Amino acid sequence: MDKQRVAVIGPGSWGTALSQVLNDNGHEVRIWGNIAEQIDEINQAHTNTRYFKDTVLDEKIKAYHSLAEALDGADAVLFVVPTKVTRLVAKQVAQILDHNVKVMHASKGLEPDSHERISTILEEEIPSELRSEIVVVSGPSHAEETIVRDITLITAASKDLEAAKYVQKLFSNHYFRLYTNTDVVGVETAGALKNIIAVGAGALHGLGYGDNAKAAIITRGLAEITRLGVKLGASPLTYSGLSGVGDLIVTGTSIHSRNWRAGDALGRGEKLADIEANMGMVIEGISTTKAAYELAQELDVYMPITQAIYKVIYQGHDIKEAIFEIMNNEFKAENEWS
């Protein structure tokens, strides 16, 4: 692939790690963020110590205070910002773009009020004449591992297979490999909803439960994620792939996962406000829990784990009582869809 100029919107942990992958592949990377000190640090010290204490970035990776400068002449734009600000940032990008670009995103969540997926937000806010079909970059990936070039395999999903193949070629190298998929609904819902289950898995750990319980919440969590996704039009096969069970395993079992760590703290009795303050990073699973619960109610989809986590986070329900209620639900067949 010829050298591409890629604007990376969001200098968080994942945006930074993906920037390094793109740079390793010989592409020109332009990061944009709105924290002046962070942008200056990337340019001057070639570090992003807010997320990576010991990592030195290549000097060719540049960061910009100006969104217009970051977008100037870009071949592709990669959104890696928190879900709750995606619409606002997309509006700003749309106002500046003056040519057609490939548009990708690597965020995982549902918009709090509308319950919309991120690709839908981008489609609504960026006119079609300025962009390709949206490509979703998602899968089992800790930024802490990708930044040190550990092997990572994820998915590039788009309604346009050629757009997905472009992103596959853009990112793939000897340690970072992408597979294409055209099931955007499946890939996005898997990536968003697994954060809820990771909060629950962390909570079980914080409460002192063992591996049996953790395996149970991951597998039954995958079942209810699949139920909601299929109701929205996804293929059930997607949930057995990298963006489904793969991402759920890595997020639901690892201390690297901020959602798992948040759940662990909840299980140990910490208050949510304190957890969010101490984390210093967005915990997508918290806001996604509310959106998914409301969506499940609207579509009449059975999601007992999501409902339990919602009650604990948003209604102050006792976490041990929530577990008791799940364990005493009516008996079900394992593959029941309701």
UniProtKB/Swiss-Prot annotation:
InterPro entries: 6-PGluconate_DH-like_C_sf, 6PGD_dom2, G3P_DH_NAD-dep, G3P_DH_NAD-dep_C, G3P_DH_NAD-dep_N, NAD(P)-bd_dom_sf
Enzyme class: oxidoreductase
Signal sequence, renumbered to the chain: none
Keywords from the UniProt entry: Cytoplasm, Lipid biosynthesis, Lipid metabolism, NAD, NADP, Nucleotide-binding, Oxidoreductase, Phospholipid biosynthesis, Phospholipid metabolism
Keyword NADP: yes
Source organism superkingdom: Bacteria
Catalytic reaction equation(s): sn-glycerol 3-phosphate + NAD(+) = dihydroxyacetone phosphate + NADH + H(+); sn-glycerol 3-phosphate + NADP(+) = dihydroxyacetone phosphate + NADPH + H(+)
UniProt-listed Enzyme Commission number(s): 1.1.1.94
GO biological process terms, semicolon-separated: carbohydrate metabolic process; glycerol-3-phosphate biosynthetic process; glycerol-3-phosphate catabolic process; glycerophospholipid metabolic process; phospholipid biosynthetic process
Cystine crosslinks: none
Compartments (UniProt record): Cytoplasm
Residues that hold NADPH according to the record: 13-14, 108, 143, 258, 282, 284
Binding sites annotated in the UniProt record for sn-glycerol 3-phosphate: 108, 139, 141, 194, 247, 257-259
Gene Ontology MF terms: glycerol-3-phosphate dehydrogenase [NAD(P)+] activity; NAD binding
Pathway(s) of this molecule: Membrane lipid metabolism; glycerophospholipid metabolism
GO cellular component, one term: cytosol
Main location: cytoplasm
Function: Catalyzes the reduction of the glycolytic intermediate dihydroxyacetone phosphate (DHAP) to sn-glycerol 3-phosphate (G3P), the key precursor for phospholipid synthesis.
Family per record: Belongs to the NAD-dependent glycerol-3-phosphate dehydrogenase family.
Protein name: Glycerol-3-phosphate dehydrogenase [NAD(P)+]
Organism of derivation: Streptococcus gordonii (strain Challis / ATCC 35105 / BCRC 15272 / CH1 / DL1 / V288)
